[in-house]
A protein has these predicted regions:
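RNase H-like two-metal-ion nuclease catalytic core shared by retroviral integrases
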Residues: 92-93, 100, 114-138, 146
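Extended, low-complexity cationic-aromatic segments
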Residues: 1-76
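The start of beta-strands in P-loop NTPase/AAA+ ATPase cores
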Residues: 7, 87-88, 112
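Short, aromatic/basic amphipathic alpha-helical patches
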Residues: 99-109
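Short, basic/hydrophobic alpha-helical segments
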Residues: 70-88
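C-terminal anion-handling pockets and recognition modules
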Residues: 5-8, 126-167
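Mobile genetic element proteins and their domesticated derivatives, centered on retroelements
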Residues: 10-12, 49, 75, 92, ...
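Short, well-ordered coil/turn elements that cap or connect secondary structure elements
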Residues: 3, 84, 108-110
């Protein structure tokens, strides 16, 4: 499989909010650090994407938590267009991922699904990509849903093939 690593697609989801900001900073000695931090209501979004060795694929932001119907819609609208025969879709053991409809759709493209063991997010390299995504989102400090979506779109373009290959 080492020679066929371009066939692997790691799928996962992560939460993003409009209150993401850096909680620490630096200032000159003797000066106080002043920065704005959100307070009050914020919007939560779910970001779903796949990681190949050459970049992020099928990114999708939704205004709801992940469930089976949303996962099936993600597979149909975002994932299927980027799948090739022989691809292996690797995902965590979330109950919403265990959809017969999604599995049939993936198999119809000649690909197949492989589930990670329970409670093992450290085996999914997309988690490292999500750490970078969230660090950039904190820097972007998006305070509206539209700004958050634009920031995510801009950040997805920052993932180089070399970087994704190293994950």
């Amino acid at each position: 499989m080492r020679e066929q690593r371009h066939r692997l697609i790691f799928i996962d989801e992560t939460g993003t909010t409009t209150k993401m900001t850096r909680l620490r900073g630096r200032a000159r000695k003797g000066e106080r650090l002043n920065a704005k931090a959100p307070f009050g209501h914020w919007g939560t979004q779910t970001f779903v994407a796949g990681l190949r060795c050459d970049g992020l694929v099928a990114p999708w932001v939704i205004d709801a938590p992940m469930n089976r119907a949303i996962f099936e819609a993600y597979v149909e609208t975002q994932l299927l267009p980027v799948l090739q025969p022989g691809d292996v879709v690797i995902l965590d053991n979330l109950s919403s991922h265990k959809s017969e409809t999604a599995e049939r759709a993936i198999r119809s493209k000649g690909a197949w699904m492989l589930f990670l063991p329970p409670y093992s997010p450290d085996l999914n390299p997309i988690e490292m990509a999500f750490a970078k995504l969230k660090a950039h989102l904190r820097s972007a400090a998006a305070r509206t849903i539209d700004a958050l979506w634009r920031a995510i779109g801009n950040i997805c373009a920052l993932f180089s093939p070399d970087e994704c290959s190293n994950y």
